[in-house]
């Protein structure tokens, strides 16, 4: 994989959180960012990212709706998705909907970095 950087699509309406994730992973991945659910779906369909980091609570289309659409899309159905949520009760619903992993907010840079590495390794 020399010279190839996996693409991570970061979907969150909070610019500070997108930046935290990007800085945590900088130098090891290429990035695209979306600030709402519809933009996330559009970019996912266009870019076919290696991993999506997806916030549950976003404008225009929430994370569960985005996740359901990704799982229905033949080209994106197997794309690993890490769901971010501040609501512990959302964890089970996200996993049932096809999330690869669910992370509770707040999390540290090391935690998101490790989760991204692990999920990508599991995917393959």
Predicted regions and their residues:
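Non-catalytic signal-transmission and effector/linker regions of two-component phosphorelay proteins
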Residues: 1-9, 110-124
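Two-component/phosphorelay signaling modules centered on CheY-like receiver
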Residues: 15-32
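Acidic catalytic/metal-coordinating carboxylates
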Residues: 36-39, 50, 62-68
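Short amphipathic alpha-helix used as the core "switch/output" element in two-component signaling
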Residues: 42, 64-77
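Active-site residues of response regulator receiver
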Residues: 55
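Receiver (REC) domain active-site loop signature in two-component systems and cognate sites
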Residues: 58
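Alpha4 helix (beta4-alpha4-beta5 surface) of REC/receiver domains from two-component response regulators
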Residues: 65, 87-104, 113-114
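Hydrophobic/aromatic residues positioned on beta-strands within the core alpha/beta folds
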Residues: 82-84
């Amino acid at each position: 994989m020399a010279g190839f950087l996996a693409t991570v699509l970061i979907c969150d309406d909070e610019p500070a959180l997108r930046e935290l994730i990007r800085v945590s992973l900088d130098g090891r991945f290429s990035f695209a960012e979306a600030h709402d659910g519809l933009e996330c779906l559009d970019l996912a369909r266009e870019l076919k990212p290696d991993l999506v980091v997806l916030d549950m609570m976003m404008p225009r289309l929430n994370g569960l709706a985005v996740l359901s659409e990704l799982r229905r899309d033949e080209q994106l159905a197997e794309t690993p998705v890490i769901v971010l949520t501040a609501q512990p009760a959302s964890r089970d619903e996200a996993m049932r909907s096809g999330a690869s992993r669910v992370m509770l907010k707040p999390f540290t840079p090391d935690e998101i970095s490790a989760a991204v590495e692990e999920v990508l390794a599991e995917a393959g």
